[in-house]
């Protein structure tokens, strides 16, 4: 016994199942029609009795009433029998289908017990913090250094501010609290403990979906697992740096902060801008 032979046999066994079920349902339909005809006769006889009472009063004797009662009782009995037969046919159809399902489950259990179903594990849904099992031949571009970006922004303040936020990032941004290998590992561990699910739960639904779509389009980034942005994912696609030196996240994916192009001039992330509303008004 192997999986292929079990599948082939199961398909053959199911060949006649549609026609068998259709035949049972046709019988149910036929009994349905008989039931409605029987109920219609009962209603007609009952209407005749009530019509006579409305015309002659309830004390007047109806010569046809006594003859109608046995027929009404007989029709009720017929209707109940038809309903029971319909239930029996429905149970037959259920048993017929359940028999094939049980046979398939039994065969699957046998194959599993013999170790013949040891295929690849099921795919898991995309997770924000999971390690990427595949590496990209062309790694995703990374955000430029914060200082490099600010220097360019200051030097070109009189020209095009958008040039300070290049859509083709260069070197990897340094983490402020990770100056060496040990500190970097500790920082990553601390950020991971926060949990991507908690961060995404606090984000608007449209932002979270946009961030995930952007990650899928960009593909896997570098081998490091340094996390950025509200979504706490590695760098991918286009990213922008917050101009607040004390920003908790530093770098942000465009989709996560609702950007479609490089921002003009000084830019603060949503978290930092809340505390700098007064400064913005002065500027």
Curated annotation (Swiss-Prot):
Q: Which Pfam families match?
A: ING (PF12998)
Query: What coarse category fits the chief subcellular location reported for this protein?
Result: nucleus
Q: Site annotated as Histone H3K4me3 binding: where?
A: 228, 239, 243, 251
According to its record, what are the GO cellular component terms?
NuA4 histone acetyltransferase complex; nucleus
Please list where the region (Disordered) is annotated.
Answer: 115-201
Q: Could you describe the subunit structure of this protein? A: Interacts with H3K4me3 and to a lesser extent with H3K4me2. Component of the NuA4 histone acetyltransferase complex.
User: Would you tell me the protein name for this molecule?
Assistant: Chromatin modification-related protein YNG2
Name the source organism: Yarrowia lipolytica (strain CLIB 122 / E 150) (Yeast)
């Amino acid at each position: 016994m192997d999986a292929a032979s079990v599948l082939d046999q199961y398909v053959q066994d199911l060949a006649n199942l549609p026609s068998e079920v259709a035949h049972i349902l046709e019988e149910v339909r036929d009994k349905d029609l008989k039931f409605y005809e029987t109920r219609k006769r009962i209603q007609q006889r009952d209407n005749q009795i009530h019509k006579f009472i409305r015309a002659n009063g309830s004390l007047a004797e109806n010569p046809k009433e006594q003859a109608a009662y046995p027929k009404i009782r007989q029709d009720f009995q017929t209707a109940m029998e038809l309903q029971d037969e319909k239930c029996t046919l429905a149970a037959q159809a259920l048993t017929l289908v359940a028999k094939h399902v049980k046979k398939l489950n039994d065969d699957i259990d046998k194959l599993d017990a013999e170790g013949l179903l040891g295929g690849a594990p099921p795919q898991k849904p995309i997770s924000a913090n999971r390690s990427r099992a595949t590496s990209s031949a062309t790694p995703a571009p990374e955000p430029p250094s914060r200082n490099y970006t600010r220097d360019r922004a200051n030097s070109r303040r009189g020209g095009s501010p958008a040039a300070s936020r290049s859509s083709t990032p260069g070197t990897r941004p340094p983490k402020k609290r990770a100056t060496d290998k040990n500190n970097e590992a500790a920082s990553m561990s601390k950020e991971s403990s926060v949990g991507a699910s908690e961060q995404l739960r606090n984000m608007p639904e449209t932002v979270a979906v946009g961030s995930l779509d952007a990650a899928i389009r960009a593909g896997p980034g570098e081998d490091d697992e340094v996390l950025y942005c509200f979504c706490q994912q590695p760098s991918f696609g286009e990213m922008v740096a917050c101009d607040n030196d004390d920003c908790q996240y530093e770098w942000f994916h465009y989709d996560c902060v609702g950007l479609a192009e490089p921002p003009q001039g000084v830019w603060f992330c949503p978290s930092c801008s809340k505390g700098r509303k007064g400064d913005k008004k002065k500027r």
